[in-house]
């Protein structure tokens, strides 16, 4: 039997991201916040006081006393399996911030636990809920680009002091790897990467990656923690032109290939090559991606429907990120689906 609205929601881990989950749960019609937990008791108390809910230093006490229907797991990646399992065993449906886990084995274990407890597991790939990415997906699905040739994602910026347990690839690449899969509807078959460790003491902090998809497109990925200004760009190149998303401004642009005509290029147009056509900036409805994400999570639970970003989606993004890390270390092309269950 599905629960009824408003659902009781809780947040475990109220750091830089978890605090916003707490806020949004107080704003949604489908949910009300019943408690927060954090190993930093002072931090938990601060957020609990802000939203007028109980605060706990031990997440297990929160789960036992508040019995939430929904739980956001926003703890460090290395704790996702432990905390997520505790929440599932308490009867809660969970949204785990990306990446789903630090290893494929942990991610698989979390998915299996959700299956055994018959609870929803959603992974917080928030970029899918960016209004510009949603619009991009719509236009690509409508065939407005024709065949897709290339997807390029650039996610660079300064080093976030909050990150300690993983490198830039596992922290940031799952966002864009998931976007590439989501927008293209295609699956990567091999990757190659060059990584560098310039400032971070334990992990790589720069990656340049190539991803080849089963259907033919090539993905290019540039991520780092070294750029003094933040850039979040996605471009999708196809036979009729190019879409570009600026995720910071939530803008979507289309640059037309003036030589593309109808379903096929004529022989004359092919000889002329590609030329600049019109540029369109699409008017988009602005909304907060996190609010859309949590709303979709809550609604899936209420409707007893699959969540929009499954545990398998999160696991595939993690597999690809770890394959990029491996390629960066070995300087070899890594085939996906061959020997990566243990990564």
Predicted features, each with a name:
Residues 95, 101-163:
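A contiguous active-site-proximal alpha/beta segment in oxidoreductase catalytic domains
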Residues 160-229, 235, 249, 312:
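Rossmann-like dinucleotide-binding domain that binds NAD(P)(H)
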């Amino acid at each position: 039997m599905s629960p009824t609205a408003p659902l009781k929601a809780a947040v475990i881990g109220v750091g830089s991201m978890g605090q916003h989950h707490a806020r949004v749960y107080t704003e949604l019609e489908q949910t009300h916040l019943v408690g927060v937990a954090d190993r930093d008791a002072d931090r938990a108390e601060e957020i609990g006081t802000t939203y007028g809910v109980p605060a706990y230093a031990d997440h297990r006490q929160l789960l036992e006393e508040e019995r939430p229907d929904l739980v956001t797991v926003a703890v460090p990646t290395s704790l996702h399996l432990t905390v997520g399992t505790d929440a599932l065993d308490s009867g809660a449906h969970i949204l785990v911030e990306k990446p789903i886990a630090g290893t494929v084995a942990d991610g698989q274990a979390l998915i299996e636990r959700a299956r055994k407890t018959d609870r929803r597991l959603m992974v917080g790939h928030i970029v899918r809920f960016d209004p510009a990415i949603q619009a991009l997906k719509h236009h690509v699905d409508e065939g407005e680009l024709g065949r897709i040739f290339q997807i390029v994602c650039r996610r660079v910026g300064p080093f976030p002091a909050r990150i300690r347990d993983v490198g830039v690839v596992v922290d940031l690449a799952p966002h864009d790897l998931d976007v590439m899969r989501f927008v293209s509807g295609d699956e990567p078959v091999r990757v190659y990467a060059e990584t560098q460790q310039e400032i971070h003491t334990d992990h790589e902090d720069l990656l340049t990656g190539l991803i080849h998809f089963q259907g033919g497109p090539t993905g290019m990925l540039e991520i780092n923690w070294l750029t003094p200004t933040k850039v979040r760009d996605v471009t999708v190149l196809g036979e009729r032109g190019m879409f570009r998303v600026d995720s910071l401004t939530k803008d979507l642009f289309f640059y037309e290939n003036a030589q593309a005509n109808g379903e096929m290029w004529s022989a004359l147009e092919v000889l002329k090559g590609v030329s600049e056509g019109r540029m369109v900036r699409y008017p988009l409805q602005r909304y907060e991606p996190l609010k859309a994400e949590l709303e979709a999570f809550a609604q899936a639970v209420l409707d007893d429907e699959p969540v929009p970003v499954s545990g398998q989606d999160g696991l595939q993004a993690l597999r690809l990120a770890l394959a990029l890390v491996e390629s960066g270390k070995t300087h070899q092309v890594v085939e996906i689906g061959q020997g990566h269950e243990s990564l």
